C-alpha cells in the first residue's frame, strides 16, 4: 500500500472505542529540553497570512505501545486550540499510523471537541513506524495549501534515516518546520528525530514518559507558532512562569 493510497482512505476511523483515562504522573522535569525547543521555535519566521487561521499537521505514532500517550494527547489537543484562539485561530489535521501499513489523515478541523471525538474513536494497534509517510503527506498538503508547521509525537524509528532526512529536507524547502517531540530516550529515534527537525528547520524536544504537563507545554508552544509565529510564541513564553523567564533572560 502506498502512502498516497493510505492517506486517501483516511477521513476517520470507523471503529470507535473509548479513550483510557490518562493520569499526569510526577515525572522528572525535562525543562531544559522544553526551553531549548521554545528558544529554537522562536527564531522561526511566521508564514501566516493576515486574516487566516494557522494550519498545523498533528501527527502521532498510534502503534500498540503508544495508547497511554494517545489518551493524553486526546485530552491535551484542546490546549492548542485555546492557545491559538486569541492569536487568530488554528486548523489542525490529525495524521496517524498504526497496524500493517495503515496511515490516515482527517480533514482540517477548527474545533477541539470535534478533534477529541475523532481521537477517542481511534485505538492503537501493533505495527512498525511509518514516519516517512507522514513527512510525504505533509509535503503534499502544503503544496495544496500552506501549512505552518508539522508536529510529530513518537518514541521509536524503524525506517531508513537517509530516506527520512531527504523527506525532511523537502519540508524545509517548502517552509514547513517539523517540531518533533520524543517520548522517552531511545537513541536511534533521537538521532533520526533530531535530523528531521534540523533539515526541516524545525525543533526537537524530548519529554518524559507519561509526562502530560511537559507535552502540554510543547503542544501549546507549537500551536502558538503555527497561529502567530515568533511574536505569539514570545508572548506565550512571557506567561509561562520562572522557566520561561529564565529562557528569555538567556536569549537577551
Predicted regions and their residues:
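Short, structured coil segments at secondary-structure junctions
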Residues: 174, 192, 199-200
Amino acid at each position: 500500500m502506498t502512502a498516497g493510497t493510505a492517506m486517501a482512505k483516511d477521513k476517520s476511523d470507523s471503529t470507535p472505542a473509548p479513550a483510557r483515562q490518562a493520569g499526569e504522573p510526577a515525572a522528572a522535569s525535562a525543562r531544559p529540553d522544553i526551553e531549548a525547543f521554545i528558544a529554537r521555535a522562536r527564531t522561526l519566521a511566521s508564514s501566516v497570512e493576515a486574516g487566516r487561521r494557522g494550519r498545523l499537521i498533528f501527527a502521532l505514532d498510534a502503534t500498540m505501545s503508544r495508547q497511554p500517550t494517545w489518551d493524553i494527547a486526546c485530552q491535551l489537543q484542546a490546549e492548542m486550540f485555546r492557545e491559538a484562539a486569541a492569536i487568530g485561530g488554528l486548523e489542525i489535521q490529525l495524521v496517524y499510523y498504526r497496524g500493517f501499513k495503515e496511515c490516515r489523515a482527517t480533514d482540517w478541523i477548527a474545533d477541539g471537541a470535534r478533534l477529541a471525538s475523532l481521537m477517542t474513536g481511534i485505538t492503537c494497534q501493533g505495527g512498525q513506524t511509518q514516519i516517512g509517510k507522514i513527512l510525504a503527506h505533509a509535503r503534499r498538503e502544503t503544496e495544496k495549501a500552506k501549512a505552518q508547521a508539522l508536529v510529530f509525537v513518537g518514541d521509536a524509528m524503524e525506517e531508513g534515516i537517509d530516506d527520512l532526512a531527504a523527506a525532511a529536507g523537502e519540508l524545509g524547502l517548502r517552509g514547513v518546520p517539523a517540531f518533533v517531540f520524543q517520548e522517552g530516550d531511545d537513541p536511534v529515534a533521537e538521532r533520526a528525530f533530531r535530523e528531521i527537525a534540523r533539515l526541516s528547520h524545525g525543533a526537537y524536544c524530548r519529554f518524559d514518559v507519561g509526562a502530560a504537563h511537559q507535552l502540554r507545554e510543547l503542544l501549546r508552544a507549537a500551536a502558538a507558532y503555527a497561529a502567530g509565529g515568533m511574536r505569539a510564541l514570545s508572548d506565550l513564553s512571557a506567561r509561562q512562569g520562572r522557566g520561561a523567564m529564565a529562557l528569555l533572560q538567556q536569549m537577551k
